[in-house]
Amino acid sequence: MLSVNPSMGLFEPLDLASLPDDKTAMSIEGLDLHYGNTQALFDINMRIAKGQVTSFIGPSGCGKSTLLRCINRMNELVDGCRVDGKIMLHGQNIYDSKVDVASLRRRVGMVFQRPNPFPKSIYENVVYGLRLQGLKERRVLDDAVEKSLRGAALWDEVKDRLHENAFGLSGGQQQRLVIARAIAIEPEVLLLDEPTSALDPISTLTIEELINDLKTKYTVIIVTHNMQQAARVSDQTAFMHMGELVEYSSTNDIFTTPKEKRTEDYITGRYG
């Protein structure tokens, strides 16, 4: 079994099946997803703990990124996608026809596998979402840039070149810039889809340390193929296989005493 970082808050395990509303960031209820005639997710039910890091793990094609993209309705950009069931955020189903998708994505930010800064300056990357919200006052924008870059552990590295093109940053710096851009609009939930898969080991470690800091202000959900990474950074772990949620528990339990044989087989390398 993998060792779990004891600094990740695992000594106060939550009963995820009966997580109270005040400790729940969102709940997923009876979620199915189809791409055309192909079903990709099957009856997913889970409560995401507020202010913690939850990881989705499983073999390629198991549905973990698909589930992640349901949480801010990114899957709707795929032709033929149909979602049934509910994802409740503060008592409202995000799939309700009355929900404004742009507003939802401000509340639920997302960072993708490869760094995707805009072809703009570092400064303009960070304030992009704020400008879309109509913020124009320079002092407010300046404060937001510093706060967000500090929150992404990047300020000290770029504070003297904020107006240089973001493409001049290293890959790891670009990914932290993307995180700064995401948190500048102060989301409630931050989704990370394999955020270190394109980075070198040193940049990966920096991002992992950042994730631990981010959970003090945001609920973080991360998809990762790297089981060691899930063990290091997350408080809760969900194991998925063939579109099903096989097991969902504290990271400590998943990696040391899994209840399901499929979970044990995966984390011990018998398949995946």
Swiss-Prot record:
GO MF annotation, one: ATP hydrolysis activity
Keyword Protein transport: no
The name this protein goes by in its record: Phosphate import ATP-binding protein PstB 1
Record text on subunit structure and interactions: The complex is composed of two ATP-binding proteins (PstB), two transmembrane proteins (PstC and PstA) and a solute-binding protein (PstS).
Subcellular location per the Swiss-Prot or TrEMBL entry: Cell inner membrane
InterPro entries linked to this entry: AAA+_ATPase, ABC_transporter-like_ATP-bd, ABC_transporter-like_CS, P-loop_NTPase, PstB-like
Residues the record lists as binding ATP: 58-65
Membrane-related topology note: Peripheral membrane protein
Domain ABC transporter: 26-267
Key words of the record: ATP-binding, Cell inner membrane, Cell membrane, Membrane, Nucleotide-binding, Phosphate transport, Translocase, Transport
Any GO BP: phosphate ion transmembrane transport
General function of this protein: Part of the ABC transporter complex PstSACB involved in phosphate import. Responsible for energy coupling to the transport system.
UniProt family annotation: Belongs to the ABC transporter superfamily. Phosphate importer (TC 3.A.1.7) family.
EC number(s) reported in the record: 7.3.2.1
Catalysed reactions, semicolon-separated: phosphate(out) + ATP + H2O = ADP + 2 phosphate(in) + H(+)
Pfam family name, one: ABC_tran
GO cellular-component term (any): plasma membrane
SUPFAM superfamilies hit by this protein: P-loop containing nucleoside triphosphate hydrolases
PANTHER family with a match to the protein in the record: ABC TRANSPORTER I FAMILY MEMBER 17, IRON EXPORT ATP-BINDING PROTEIN FETA-RELATED
Organism, scientific name: Photobacterium profundum (strain SS9)
Gene: pstB1
